[in-house]
Amino acid sequence: MIYQPLDPLLHAELRLAVMSLLISNVEAEFPYIKEQTGSTAGNLSVQIDKLSSAGYIKVKKTFKGKRPCTICRITSKGQKAFEAYVQALKSYLEVGDK
């Protein structure tokens, strides 16, 4: 097979955006991710839960003063999955080069 399968969990636009942010920042707070992705808080929360359930990110809920603070951090499993996704995507782009 010329094409490598794409991870369906990462193929969703918002989850891919979250992973892309975390791959370069390692960790980020929820408001930053929300701002950078242009997502609603509800949708982002659902997508973060899916990534967390898969073990791609870890979510830490703390407080900054009296305000809740959610921090997302990419895991080594998430890094490997993202790298595999990028390589699989390249297999689609390089077909014409062969």
How would you describe each model-predicted region?
Residues 1-3, 20, 79-98:
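Amphipathic alpha-helical dimerization/coiled-coil segments
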Residues 2-40, 62-64, 71-73:
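N-terminal helix-turn-helix DNA-binding core of bacterial DNA-binding proteins
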Residues 48-51:
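Basic amphipathic alpha-helical segments that dock to polyanions
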Residues 55:
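Glycine-centered, phosphate/nucleic-acid-interacting loop/turn motifs that mediate DNA/RNA or nucleotide
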Residues 59:
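Short beta-strand "wing" residues that participate in macromolecule-binding interfaces
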Residues 74-78:
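Accessory beta->alpha helical hairpin/"wing" motif in late/C-terminal subdomains of nucleic-acid enzymes
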